[in-house]
């Protein structure tokens, strides 16, 4: 299936390549570089590129491109999912999926790729199995290996490889048994000039950190599970139980993993947490304009909206901006024409505003349309969809674990049109 894999940085340098069948020349990546030059942004490079003799299927993660070379037609999403598993494995092993981390652990990287793909077909992608096959790097292990010439490859077959729950290894023991869940939601929205919602959607995930001894069987229930759409599950979840009772029943992997990802697409269920009052005007045959925006919380949710950043791509005729913020600080790049206002927290008693003059090129025509505002924010201890965990029950073990749930709401692609 997958013949070769190339890792490419943002500068266009191929810093690692791996071949499972015949060696494919690096020149095949020229088709990828051509598509990259045509793309307006790095995220807009086509994930599937057809060439005369190959297909190039790629993902972009952490400022790196993972480009796989395929010689026969395969389901592209199958390959894309595998490439994401590779990136997730690097993140799990090295703490980050970066060019520096991969170069520092290049031997382990090749060992992992050899185990994850067998003759071009995915074999072992579960982190628990891989960690039994290839030990994660430590300072002590790296020092011993450099002296003795040994490798990180284990000498025993993973206990989970042949079981019906391959995602969990046997014999797990902890002094402190704990199970923590993070409910993280991103809200994507488009707000028109009048403040009405044109589009709104919530993308959510539940990430788990499970450190439990033995072979626990967990059941996670919600107060309102019916609002979830398009749920994607970790393989450990019993799907029939979810279909019948809307309860997540599973034997968890050991450590950190993504339990589910979901979507809330009903616009009447999506609450918009912030509002923006704006007045941006450019006069005809004038060298100046007015800029005035105020941001505030839309409803009293009892939670503080923090980490607010407003980014505006101003028209090309803008030379400079003389603005006064009542809170935070702003920067304007006269080259890229990007205005960034770092607001910080919002308090309902004092709404932050940014207002002042815009200097335009003399004699230039009035901009055809006003710029849009892109907003970033974060709300701690709130799931904007209203999703709440009801309880976590454990079966199969007699100890009582520590349990906890954390909620976070973030802005995804949140745009206000002016």
Curated annotation (Swiss-Prot):
GO terms for cellular component: axon cytoplasm; clathrin adaptor complex; cytoplasmic vesicle; cytoplasmic vesicle membrane; Golgi apparatus. InterPro entries: Adaptor_comp_med_subunit, AP2_Mu_C_sf, AP_mu_sigma_su, Clathrin_mu, Clathrin_mu_CS, Longin-like_dom_sf, MHD. Residues 176-417 form the MHD domain. Pfam families: Adap_comp_sub, Clat_adaptor_s. It is a peripheral membrane protein. PROSITE patterns: CLAT_ADAPTOR_M_1 (PS00990), CLAT_ADAPTOR_M_2 (PS00991), MHD (PS51072). Keywords: Cytoplasmic vesicle, Golgi apparatus, Membrane, Protein transport, Transport. Transmembrane segments: none annotated. PANTHER family: AP COMPLEX SUBUNIT MU. Part of the AP-3 complex, an adaptor-related complex which is not clathrin-associated. The complex is associated with the Golgi region as well as more peripheral structures. It facilitates the budding of vesicles from the Golgi membrane and may be directly involved in trafficking to lysosomes. In concert with the BLOC-1 complex, AP-3 is required to target cargos into vesicles assembled at cell bodies for delivery into neurites and nerve terminals. Adaptor protein complex 3 (AP-3) is a heterotetramer composed of two large adaptins (delta-type subunit AP3D1 and beta-type subunit AP3B1 or AP3B2), a medium adaptin (mu-type subunit AP3M1 or AP3M2) and a small adaptin (sigma-type subunit APS1 or AP3S2). Interacts with AGAP1. AP-3 associates with the BLOC-1 complex. This is AP-3 complex subunit mu-1. The lineage of its organism: Eukaryota, Metazoa, Chordata, Craniata, Vertebrata.
């Amino acid at each position: 299936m997958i013949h070769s894999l190339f890792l490419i940085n943002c500068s266009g340098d191929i810093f690692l390549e791996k071949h499972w069948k015949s060696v494919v020349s690096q020149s095949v990546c020229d088709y990828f570089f051509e598509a990259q030059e045509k793309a307006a942004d790095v995220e807009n490079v086509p994930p599937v590129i057809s060439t005369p003799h190959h297909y190039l299927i790629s993902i972009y993660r952490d400022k790196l491109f993972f480009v796989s070379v395929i010689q026969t037609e395969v389901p592209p999403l199958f390959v894309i999912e595998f490439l994401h598993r590779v990136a997730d494995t690097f993140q799990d092993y090295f703490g980050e999926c970066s060019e520096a981390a991969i170069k520092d652990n290049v031997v382990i990287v090749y060992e992992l790729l050899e185990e994850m793909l067998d003759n071009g077909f995915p074999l072992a992608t579960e982190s628990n199995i891989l960690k039994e096959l290839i030990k994660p790097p430590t300072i002590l292990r790296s020092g011993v290996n450099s002296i003795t010439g040994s490798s990180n490859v284990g000498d025993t077959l993973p206990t989970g490889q042949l079981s019906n729950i391959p995602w969990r290894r046997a014999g797990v023991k902890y002094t402190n048994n704990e199970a923590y869940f993070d409910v993280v939601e991103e809200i994507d929205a488009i707000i028109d000039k009048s403040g009405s919602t044109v589009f709104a959607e919530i993308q959510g995930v539940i990430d788990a950190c499970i450190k439990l001894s033995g072979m626990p069987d967990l059941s996670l229930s919600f107060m309102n599970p019916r609002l979830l759409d398009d749920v994607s599950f970790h393989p450990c979840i019993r799907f029939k139980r979810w279909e019948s009772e809307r309860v997540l029943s599973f034997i968890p992997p050991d450590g950190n993993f993504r339990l589910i990802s979901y979507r809330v697409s009903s616009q009447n269920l999506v609450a918009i947490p912030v509002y923006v009052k704006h007045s941006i005007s450019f006069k005809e045959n004038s060298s100046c304009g007015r800029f005035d925006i105020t941001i505030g919380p839309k409803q009293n949710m009892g939670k503080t909206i923090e980490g607010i950043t407003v980014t505006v791509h101003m028209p090309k005729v803008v030379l400079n901006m003389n603005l006064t913020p009542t809170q935070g600080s702003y920067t304007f790049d006269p080259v890229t024409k990007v205005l960034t206002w770092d607001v910080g927290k919002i308090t309902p008693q004092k709404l932050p505003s940014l207002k002042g003059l815009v200097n335009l090129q003399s004699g230039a025509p009035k901009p055809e349309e006003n710029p849009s505002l892109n907003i970033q924010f974060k709300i701690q201890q709130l799931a904007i969809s209203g999703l709440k965990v009801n309880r976590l029950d454990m079966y199969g073990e007699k100890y009582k674990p520590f349990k906890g749930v954390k909620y976070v709401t973030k802005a995804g692609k949140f745009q206000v049109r002016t």
